[in-house]
């Protein structure tokens, strides 16, 4: 598995807290499209199809 970048880990951490894309964008001072791209990359690196699956897989792998 390709490692997550620091920013991807930040986004994943916020996803695990239940934050929406707009909340993540606001907190990290990013555009919503950039957040969506990070979520897409996270899912690809974890080999999953959804943000919920990404959270479950990240927890099972103790990524955060």
What are these regions (language model features)?
Residues 1-40, 60-63:
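Helix-turn-helix DNA-binding segment
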Residues 44-64:
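Basic, Lys/Arg-enriched C-terminal extension of HTH/homeodomain DNA-binding domains
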